[in-house]
Each structure stands twice: as structure tokens, then as C-alpha cells.
Amino acid sequence: MDGIFISYRRDDSAGYAGRLYDRLAAHFGAERVFMDVEGIEPGLDFVDAIEEAVSSCRVLIAVIGDEWTNAADAAGRRRLDDPNDFIRLETGAALKRGIRVVPVLVGGAVMPLAADLPEELKALTRRQAIEINHKQWEASTGELIRTLESILKTPPVATAAGNQPSADPGVAKVSAVSGSMAGNAAATHGNSRRWALPA
């Protein structure tokens, strides 16, 4: 249970998230770094699937760009106000389970205010953030890597729900999320590992 889960919005920080994946995978190994929960076998509960995927990791990186808080859907509704928003589900699952959440600010973004977040995400505003940028990529991501190294070498704690996280590496949990999903529904992002969820 030593995986790193990268949570991000495609229309907000996809460029940063993809580059960050490559940097972390090169340092920690591709089998320990995951990004995207975007598809799941028909008939499975996607909320449960996201919680299982997140719980297989030791730390969740919340990549926050300047549209992370106010991004809207096609109808103009703020995505964070949707209980089924993937970012809300991913981050909320990590906070609920006591998984370490590291906010990573990109593109000049600032931390959201608690008043602007749904109840289950308000604790995110109390997490110390790291800022990364393309101009100082090696230095800023180096700080993040040192933080992750410190987290991953620390023994895991019991989750808020009283359940002990799985000891298996995150890569083994792809199949736990959706049975045979790893074999027939995985998507790719460069060399990234992704859980595929139906659109």
C-alpha cells in the first residue's frame, strides 16, 4: 500500500499532471504511480470503485489549477457541487480514509477557501501545499519528491473509518477495483497507469 495517486482536472491541469506523472514514475517506479479513474465496468458502483482505487494508495496528490474550484459542466453548474464529481469523490475518499493528501498548486493557483468547498473537502484547506511550475520544474518537483519519500517511508496509520489500508502495492488493486478491468478496460496516458471508468 505504497502507491501515489494523482488527482487532477483535465481542463484545469492536465499538462502539469502528465508531466508530473512522468517525473514521479521515473523516480518511484511506474508501478507505484497512478493517475485517472475514468472508466469502470458496466454495473459496478463508480463511487465504490473510486474509493477502492484511492484506498490502494498511500498518498493522494491533489493537483490544483486556477479553475479547480470553479470549473463548470456543460450546463454551467460548478462541478464541485456535484456529489458525483470525480475530483470531489477522489479527494473526499482520501480525506475520509486518513490517506495523506498533498495539494500541489500549478499555474499560479492558490489554495481554495473552506467556504468554497463541499463539507467533505473542507479539511483540504488545512493541508500544507507545494507549488510547482514549469520554469523551475526540477527544483519544485524535487521538493515534492522529498515530501513523498518521507511519507512513503513512514508506517501507515489506521484509517478514519477504523479500517487498515491494504498492504498490497497499488498496482495490484486495479483488478480489485473492477475485476478484470486491468485486462480489458485500461487506458493509457503516455506511460501512465490509469483506471478506466465509463464516460
Task: Label each region the model flagged.
Residues 26, 116-126:
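Short, conserved catalytic or adaptor-binding loops enriched in Gly and charged residues
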Residues 108-111, 115-118:
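A cross-family acyltransferase "interaction/gating" segment
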